[in-house]
């Protein structure tokens, strides 16, 4: 995914854990990768994390595929109780362009709006250690006959 926070109007990304959107068992087998194309600063909406939150969070709130609509498209919804994070525990993580941030599937993170005169571009994607890992059948994103998730390597 390519993220582009435009100057002055690039919005916030609300606090969340990636496990809400990508449920696997065991959950520690999902990892986000975030690569800034521009320096990510306090002013242009750098990432914020709650340190150590991956050790205490669980996935009780999920974005899931429920069933197909009459047109055959999947119906997506949130299930469960959303975690409420203490906002004063978030710590900003300004980072230089070209760096790499690894994001555990249970760590609480967010970003603030871009209030600067400069854009903030970033690439992000998620990887799953598929070895001995179950991909939940109600995840919003599912492989199909036409599109299989690519393997980065084989064990």
Where are these regions (language model features)?
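Conserved double-stranded beta-helix
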Residues: 1-49, 54-55
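Intrinsic-disorder/low-complexity, polar/charged segments enriched in Ser/Thr/Lys/Arg/Asp/Glu/Gln
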Residues: 30-32, 90, 100, 122
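Non-heme Fe(II)/2-oxoglutarate
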Residues: 58-66, 97-102, 106-155
């Amino acid at each position: 995914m390519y993220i582009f926070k435009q100057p002055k109007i690039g919005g916030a990304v609300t606090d969340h854990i990636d496990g809400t959107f990508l449920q696997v068992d065991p959950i520690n087998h999902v990892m986000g990768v975030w690569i800034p194309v521009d320096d990510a600063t306090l002013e242009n909406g750098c990432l914020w994390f709650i340190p150590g939150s991956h050790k205490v969070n669980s996935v009780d709130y999920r974005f899931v595929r429920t069933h197909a609509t009459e047109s055959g498209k999947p119906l997506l919804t949130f299930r469960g109780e959303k975690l409420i994070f203490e906002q004063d525990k978030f710590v900003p993580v300004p980072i230089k362009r070209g760096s790499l941030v690894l994001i555990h599937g249970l760590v609480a993170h967010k970003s603030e709006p871009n209030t600067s005169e400069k854009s903030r571009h970033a690439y992000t994607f998620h990887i799953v250690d598929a070895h001995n890992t179950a991909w939940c059948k109600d995840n919003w994103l599912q492989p199909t006959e036409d599109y299989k998730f690519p393997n980065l390597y084989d064990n």
